[in-house]
Regions:
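Alpha-helical transmembrane-segment detector that highlights a single hydrophobic TM helix
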Residues: 67-90
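Alpha-helical transmembrane segments and their membrane-interface boundaries
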Residues: 1-74, 121-124, 140-147, 151
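Hydrophobic alpha-helical membrane segments of integral membrane proteins
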Residues: 99-104, 122-127
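Small-residue-rich segments of transmembrane alpha-helices in multi-pass membrane proteins
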Residues: 48-58, 80-83, 104-117
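Membrane-helix interface "capping/anchor" motifs
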Residues: 36-41, 91-102
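Hydrophobic transmembrane alpha-helices of secondary-active transporters
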Residues: 25-30, 84-91, 113
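Alpha-helical transmembrane segments and their membrane-interface exit regions
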Residues: 82-85, 130-140
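Membrane-helix boundary connector in multi-pass membrane proteins
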Residues: 94-96, 110-123
Length: 151
């Protein structure tokens, strides 16, 4: 009996490591673009958000059947919590609002963590690639449009 319990425990630990690693990689990829552009929330913030969201979801899924934890409620609270963090990076200066893209990116990093925690790795890869591409492509388009408008 001891052997089976050890195997089951090792599977749980391996599953946890896999999910946290996936969340970490997604957060790093998303944060790398923000860091490269010198934004206020870069590698560390996006990676920690993805990991934190993953841990909260993993915990809720772990105890869902034992204590009647509703994992969807935990997911919604992750969104609320990230909303506060995102609000902290949004600034208004004169008639311009700055930080909306960074706030939205932090929100997407939390979603990446949630996807990793639920084992939706293909969806996680698609989300991560889309977030990076959107930030890169539309960041370039935005700056190009701003230059033309200023002329």
């Amino acid at each position: 009996m001891m052997f089976i319990e050890t195997v089951i425990e090792n599977i749980k630990v391996t599953d946890f490591i896999l999910k946290i690693s996936a969340a970490t990689i997604a957060g790093l990829l998303i944060g790398l673009e923000r860091e490269y552009k010198g934004k206020s929330a870069g590698l560390k913030t996006n990676t920690l958000v993805a990991i934190g969201a993953a841990v909260f979801v993993i915990i809720s899924l772990q105890y869902e059947h034992q204590f009647g934890v509703d994992a969807t409620r935990v997911l919604s609270q992750v969104v609320v919590g990230i909303g506060f963090l995102g609000a902290g990076v949004i600034l208004q200066k004169e008639n311009k609002i700055k930080g909306l893209t960074t706030a939205a990116t932090i929100w997407c990093s939390a979603a990446a963590g949630c996807l990793a925690a639920t084992g939706l790795y293909i969806e996680l890869a698609v989300l991560s690639i889309l977030v990076v591409l959107i930030n890169l492509i539309f960041g370039y388009v935005d700056s190009h449009i701003e230059k033309k408008v200023k002329k």
